[in-house]
Amino acid sequence: GAALEPVPVASNIPIELDFSQDRGKIAVTFASPSDVPSTAKAIYMVGDEFGNMNWGSDGVISLDKVWNSADRWIHINYFNAGTKLRFSTSKIFGDGEFTGLTNNVGFEISDEGLVVIPQSGTYIIFVDLGSKTISIQKPVIYGYGTAAGGNNEKILPFTESSDGKTFSVTLPNGGRFRIHPYIPAFDN
């Protein structure tokens, strides 16, 4: 068969192989909020619908820095209801992994300790290491610049499709254009 993707694992992590069920289990303890650093060089996200919960997968998502900050990170994506996620400051099982911080907004934590997406739709995931906040909320996306009619960051709102998969806008002018996601967690 096809070669399996290698799994990056930190030292002293117990691994159990269950040949009767054709499964393996990596016994990882997620970092407590106080053990998650207040800044990071990167924040990664993996899920059961992308990356196959494997930090060695090509499907691992790198969150984007907010401006030039080392503590605030975002990612906008469409997720199916029930998608499970985990985050990390490195792409290694047992090193820097977390699923909840002190303030968790817009999601539940499963019995396995994983973040669970509440309903199918497009969400903005916001991780603020400084305030120890993870927020998963519906995005509001605006366009701005001369093509949008001005440089106010909230001048031209995009419209979300009924299935929540796409957002669209018609530009009133030609010229420069930027996209600005409003991040509700910044208001908290």
What are these regions (language model features)?
Residues 1-188:
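Insoluble glucan recognition modules
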